């Protein structure tokens, strides 16, 4: 399980160094194999260990290619999916087209989200967090049943 937000830097080749606390888990559970794709709702990337991505692919394969909305989701997620292998120094190379989608240049937020990471440009991440907090403060109590049952 991945949690927390960590500032990491991309090097000049577009590689990010995976924080040490995740490396062993990624090596053990995925042999360091990851899949990166775009987030279709936000200007960030989604980074999955290969076994987790294979579950997503199975779900995508069950969508109808005859349904325009389902086909669009398949096209966006699978069409942008890029395999990346963690090297001996714990780095992952993020494809240029993916970095461009999320506006990633130097400082990147690696955000744990249970079974995957989100990769955000640092400035965009802080803006998104502010927007999310502001939206919650303005919310009128329209919580789903699942959120109502969540006790923090």
Swiss-Prot record:
It is found in: Cytoplasm, Nucleoid. Belongs to the MraZ family. One of its GO terms (molecular function) is DNA-binding transcription factor activity. This is Transcriptional regulator MraZ. The keyword Cell membrane does not apply. It holds the Pfam family MraZ. GO terms for biological process: negative regulation of DNA-templated transcription initiation. The gene is mraZ. InterPro entries: MraZ (IPR003444), MraZ_C (IPR035644), MraZ_dom (IPR020603), MraZ_N (IPR035642), MraZ_sf (IPR038619), SpoVT-AbrB_dom (IPR007159), SpoVT-AbrB_sf (IPR037914). Forms oligomers. Negatively regulates its own expression and that of the subsequent genes in the proximal part of the division and cell wall (dcw) gene cluster. Acts by binding directly to DNA. May also regulate the expression of genes outside the dcw cluster. PROSITE patterns: SPOVT_ABRB. Residues 5-52, 81-124 form the SpoVT-AbrB domain. One of its GO terms (cellular component) is nucleoid. Gene3D superfamilies: Transcriptional regulator MraZ domain (3.40.1550.20). Keywords: Cytoplasm, DNA-binding, Repeat, Repressor, Transcription, Transcription regulation. PANTHER family: TRANSCRIPTIONAL REGULATOR MRAZ (PTHR34701:SF1).
């Amino acid at each position: 399980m991945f949690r927390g937000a960590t500032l990491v830097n991309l090097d000049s080749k577009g590689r990010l160094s995976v924080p040490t606390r995740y490396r062993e888990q990624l090596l053990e559970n995925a042999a360091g194999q990851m899949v990166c794709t775009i987030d279709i709702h936000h200007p960030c990337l989604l980074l999955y260990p290969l076994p987790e991505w294979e579950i997503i692919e199975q779900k995508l394969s069950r969508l109808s290619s005859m349904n325009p909305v389902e086909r669009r989701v398949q096209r966006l997620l699978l069409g942008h999916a890029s395999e990346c292998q963690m090297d001996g120094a714990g780095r992952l190379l993020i494809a240029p087209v993916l970095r461009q989608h999320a506006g990633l240049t130097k400082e990147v937020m690696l955000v744990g989200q249970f079974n995957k990471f989100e990769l955000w440009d640092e400035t965009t991440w802080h803006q998104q967090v502010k927007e999310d907090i502001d939206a919650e403060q303005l919310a009128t109590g329209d919580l789903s049943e699942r959120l109502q049952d969540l006790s923090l």
